[in-house]
Amino acid sequence: MVQQIWETLKETITAYTGLSPAAFFTVLALAFAVYQVVSGFFVSPEVHRPRSLEVQPQSEPLPPPVQLGEITEEELKLYDGSDSKKPLLMAIKGQIYDVSQSRMFYGPGGPYALFAGKDASRALAKMSFEDQDLTGDISGLGAFELEALQDWEYKFMSKYVKVGTIQKKDGEGKESSEPSEAKTASAEGLSTNTGEEASAITHDETSRSTGEKIAETTEKKDVATDDDDAAKE
């Protein structure tokens, strides 16, 4: 049965193509190979991508921001992105923000990596990357620079979570308290001096009034004595 089918197939191939069965199947195989090569230029690579590559591992979600409270500038430096297990932090005007979601910008190798782990208020206001500007000291800045810094602060407040503040140095607290104490002492001294002056003035006026009264009484007595003497004469 199979032999009959094969003989019939060979006769049909020879009758319709003029080729031997071996030549016919060779041409058919070459045509299929050419089709596969040509179709590869027009079909999207995703069609030929292995299924194992289609399932890409999802990136791990970022942990929720952790509130740190008040920390020093030295402690803030530990969150500059060098340790991938720690959040990436940055401060503006003493307020610390978690910028881990923008690690591509503020993390190692990013365009703003120098600002991470620091209060970069002055650098942001001046758009400077100089080491001396990587500080939270904004004294001496112009109106335009302060406005630019304000824009940065609004951006951070709307995009990132605030996780703490930078602890003020002891010197700053003393400097701020000493002028107040000096003002208080000055005010107390002024009040005391004013009270003493007022008391002295009142005492002088009282003394003058008493002296004037005594003088008037003496004059009256002298006049009365003179009148008596005149009457006797």
From Swiss-Prot:
Domain Cytochrome b5 heme-binding: 70-167
GO MF term (any one): steroid binding
Gene3D superfamilies: Cytochrome b5-like heme/steroid binding domain
Region (Disordered): 169-233
Transmembrane parts of this sequence: 23-43
Basic and acidic residues compositional bias, start-end: 169-181, 202-224
Keywords on record: Cell membrane, Lipid-binding, Membrane, Phosphoprotein, Steroid-binding, Transmembrane, Transmembrane helix
GO cellular component: chloroplast thylakoid membrane; cytosol; endoplasmic reticulum; plasma membrane
Segments for region (Steroid-binding): 70-167
Annotated localization: Cell membrane
Modification Phosphothreonine, positions: 225
Comment text on domains: The cytochrome b5 heme-binding domain lacks the conserved iron-binding His residues at positions 105 and 129.
UniProt family annotation: Belongs to the cytochrome b5 family. MAPR subfamily.
Protein name: Membrane steroid-binding protein 2
Species of origin: Arabidopsis thaliana
